[in-house]
Regions:
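Conserved N-terminal beta-strand and adjoining loop/helix that marks the start
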Residues: 1-22, 43, 74
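A structural signal for short, well-ordered beta-strand segments
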Residues: 10, 54, 90-92
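Short helix-loop capping/hinge motifs at secondary-structure junctions, enriched
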Residues: 18-19, 98-102
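Conserved Nudix-box catalytic region and its N-terminal flanking loop in Nudix hydrolases
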Residues: 19-60
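Nudix hydrolase/Nudix homology domain
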Residues: 31-34, 90, 101-146
Length: 146
């Protein structure tokens, strides 16, 4: 991943053991992504681990603390491609403290039921996040969260 921007994303769920809902965040900017849904998270700062970046970003963006679970890994490669300059790694995360609020970069948050995967797929996701949503739904349906 040398030379690429590294982004950490969180699939915030209501329970790591038996997830029923996923927290989706609607972008307010930049214009090309405004109104589209994504996994909350952000870029790593110099010397920061993916896990530390996730904890920092979720506190800054949503005002929450979480417990991280397993990573939602792609079928090929170490990270999900976002574009030609950036890649993202995503972890399941369980809300520990705080009430999620759209503090930065988002104008709406929504808990999406996971029991019917089609409902999560009806949101207009940022295109690069859609394959991650599909992989997450497959993992939840098969019970492969650990």
């Amino acid at each position: 991943m040398t030379g690429l921007i590294s982004v950490a994303g969180a699939a915030v769920v209501d329970s790591l053991e038996n997830p029923k809902r996923l927290l989706a965040a609607r972008r307010s900017a930049p214009p090309q992504f405004a109104g589209m849904w994504e996994f909350p998270g952000g870029k790593l700062e110099a010397g920061e681990s993916f896990e530390d970046a996730l904890h920092r970003e979720l506190l800054e963006e949503l005002g929450i603390t979480v417990r991280l679970g397993s990573e939602v890994e792609p079928d090929a490669g170490a990270a999900w491609p976002l574009n030609e300059r950036a890649v993202m790694r995503v972890w399941f995360a369980e809300l520990l403290d705080g009430e999620p609020r759209p503090l930065q970069d988002h104008d709406e948050l929504r808990w999406v039921p996971l029991g019917n995967g089609d409902e999560a797929l009806t949101l207009p996701w940022i295109p690069a996040d859609l394959p991650i949503v599909r992989a997450l739904l497959e993992r939840v349906a098969s019970g492969l969260l650990n």
